[in-house]
């Protein structure tokens, strides 16, 4: 038994010597205990970075949804293009999806309360219909959804629709004007528009000065042409004033518009520049007195006057007269002179005190006062 045990130990010993005597391959080294045995590779792998959608940026700007459709023959519908060209006499039906729809269309149709246009609100859409169209109806038609809380509504900017329609009429290249001569005021602090709009989309339109006779180029810097508005003076100044007209050419025909008198405004926009002056600040009993309130402003800006005077509570009879006229202040500068005068006859003690005038326009109001004493 011992012999077999010794023989087995001898064989194991020889086997271990054979293993330890083997040579390692070139460029190989023995693995350390616990070393990663995964075969290394030279392949480069580009890490993938997951794309994260920026929800805040996407949600901050709501998408605008066009809600307008044009009704065609036989009940067909289509989304109207930004501009449409139709023949005068054709009917137009536009629909906008929504239970509360607001509409805007050329002011010409509203000014004369034209029965050719009708606006209706149905359960699911608003409807605008225009029949027997004319070239004067050329303009923008737009709609929008309304967000209402009770009787108070506001425009939903995300649900709108619009189209500009040219109504082409034989012999009419320009949208008709109610007069043969219009005035355009040139304000130094805002754009001015010569409103010669055409009824044919493809018409070539140029601007001309009457004297000295020459074409005024729309160079895109001082003057640009907008088919929806006309010729736009971006930065008006006094050199632009004078008489101008437009010329349109289309289909081998040409036409001249009405004439426009361009007047430069010397007074910039703002609340009324107001002064007050009494005919006398000391008045004897039984005499008459007048107090004058004067405003110099833009030619096309109306001014409203209101008065507060000492005898008002006692219903003292007075006379108030408002007038205005255009005046030229040299170098072609034109301003509007607006005046209001309050007259008190047979002056009494209750008429003594402060006479207060308030002048108001679209930009604001100005209040001035003066005193009239009893002497």
UniProtKB/Swiss-Prot annotation:
The entry's keywords: Disulfide bond, Glycoprotein, Immunoglobulin domain, Repeat, Secreted, Signal
SMART domains, alphabetized: IG, IGc2
Region of interest (Disordered), ranges: 22-64
Cysteines joined through disulfide linkages: 96-143, 293-357
Localisation per UniProt entry: Secreted
Signal sequence residues: 1-21
Pfam families according to UniProt: Ig_3, VEGFR-1-like_Ig-like
Domain of life: Eukaryota
Name of the protein this chain belongs to: Platelet-derived growth factor receptor-like protein
Species per Swiss-Prot/TrEMBL record: Macaca fascicularis (Crab-eating macaque)
Protein's gene: PDGFRL
């Amino acid at each position: 038994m011992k012999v077999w045990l010794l023989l087995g130990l001898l064989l194991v010993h020889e086997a271990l010597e054979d293993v330890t005597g083997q040579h390692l391959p070139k460029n190989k080294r023995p693995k350390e205990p616990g070393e990663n045995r995964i075969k290394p590779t030279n392949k480069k792998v580009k890490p993938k970075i997951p794309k994260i959608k920026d929800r805040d940026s996407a949600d901050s700007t709501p998408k605008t949804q066009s809600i307008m459709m044009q009704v065609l023959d036989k009940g067909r519908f289509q989304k109207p293009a930004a501009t449409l060209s139709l023949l005068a006499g054709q009917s137009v039906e536009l629909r906008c999806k929504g239970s509360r729809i607001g509409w805007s269309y050329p002011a010409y149709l509203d000014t004369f309360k034209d029965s050719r246009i009708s606006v209706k609100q149905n359960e699911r859409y608003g409807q605008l219909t225009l029949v027997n169209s004319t070239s004067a109806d050329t303009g923008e038609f737009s709609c929008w959804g309304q967000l209402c809380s009770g009787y108070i509504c506001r425009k939903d900017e995300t649900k709108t629709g619009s189209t500009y329609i040219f109504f082409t009429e034989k012999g009419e290249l320009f949208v008709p004007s109610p007069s043969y001569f219009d005035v355009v005021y040139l304000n130094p602090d805002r754009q001015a528009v010569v409103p010669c709009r055409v009824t044919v989309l493809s018409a070539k339109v140029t601007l001309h000065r009457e004297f000295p006779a020459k074409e005024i180029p729309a160079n895109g810097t001082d003057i640009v042409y907008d088919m929806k508005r006309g010729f736009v003076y971006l930065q008006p100044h006094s050199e632009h004033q004078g008489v101008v007209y437009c010329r349109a050419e289309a289909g081998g025909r040409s036409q001249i518009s009405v004439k426009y008198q361009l007047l430069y405004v010397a007074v910039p926009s703002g609340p009324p520049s107001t002064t007050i002056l009494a005919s006398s600040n000391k008045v004897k009993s039984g005499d008459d007195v007048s107090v004058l309130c004067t405003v110099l402003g833009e030619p096309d800006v109306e001014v409203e006057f209101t008065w507060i005077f000492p005898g008002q509570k006692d219903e003292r009879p007075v006379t108030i007269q408002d007038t205005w006229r255009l005046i030229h202040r040299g170098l072609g500068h034109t301003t509007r002179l607006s005046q209001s005068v309050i007259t008190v006859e047979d002056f009494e003690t209750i008429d003594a005190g402060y006479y207060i005038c308030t002048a108001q326009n679209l930009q604001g109001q100005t209040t001035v006062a003066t005193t009239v004493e009893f002497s």
